[in-house]
């Protein structure tokens, strides 16, 4: 267990946990192949030449293949029409080899992201963005949960065990992280507060939390004196800021790490905390989708 300083916070190693989850997924794939006569399949669609998106798509392809799954990569030019993209999604919906469909965001401005997400078959929506899956999460039914908040919950439960009765503050209310994160914590019987840009005296709200999840996209906004001693801090932010050398940059989270680590009981670093969990949970969701679609039981506790 790594700590910051003599009495500082435990560092939550998301990279190590993600590696373990990916290994468990890979271990479960051969049994599915035998039962279903095929490998689980993940289709990733990229529109345009966005550099960051290309990196993410390559990482997802590599991880999918390493897990023993089929990776179906579809690239469209930035000039592709919305109609072309929707037609591709419909073809993937109908393709029995494909268990999960992921359309890499952001999309070019002439394409309606909401319409594209709504076209994905909810049972193949391994990103958990479809309104049907959002509704399933809200009412406690089985569906697909967005990868980042589910990864955060896994790290929290691994660190703290039973979360029942704990005070949790989620900073940020996006559909991708904040809202589903709050729903997951509520399902774990936490007392949940969602904070945002209009929250009055945000620092005071955060100070009462046993669990802080920061997902606002503002570099080092959450200061150390906001953190309750012993709290668990999950930093979802990934922000690029100027580095020490001219022309260089570095990655920081939404939490002032050194300050918070001096007070918290445990904290995720940036990088190496939440980030690696996202692709690992994507593989997990794809494996679950494959089992559900094929009518094959996934042994309880096999992948977490």
Swiss-Prot record:
Keywords: Amino-acid biosynthesis, Histidine biosynthesis, Hydrolase, Methionine biosynthesis, Multifunctional enzyme, NADP, One-carbon metabolism, Oxidoreductase, Purine biosynthesis. InterPro entries: Aminoacid_DH-like_N_sf, NAD(P)-bd_dom_sf, THF_DH/CycHdrlase, THF_DH/CycHdrlase_cat_dom, THF_DH/CycHdrlase_CS, THF_DH/CycHdrlase_NAD-bd_dom. Its EC number is 1.5.1.5, 3.5.4.9. NADP(+) binds at residues 172-174, 197, 238. Gene3D superfamilies: Leucine Dehydrogenase, chain A, domain 1, NAD(P)-binding Rossmann-like Domain. The keyword Hydrolase applies. Pathway: One-carbon metabolism; tetrahydrofolate interconversion. Homodimer. Belongs to the tetrahydrofolate dehydrogenase/cyclohydrolase family. Catalyzes the oxidation of 5,10-methylenetetrahydrofolate to 5,10-methenyltetrahydrofolate and then the hydrolysis of 5,10-methenyltetrahydrofolate to 10-formyltetrahydrofolate. This is Bifunctional protein FolD 3. It comes from Rhizorhabdus wittichii (strain DSM 6014 / CCUG 31198 / JCM 15750 / NBRC 105917 / EY 4224 / RW1) (Sphingomonas wittichii). The lineage of its organism: Bacteria, Pseudomonadati, Pseudomonadota, Alphaproteobacteria, Sphingomonadales.
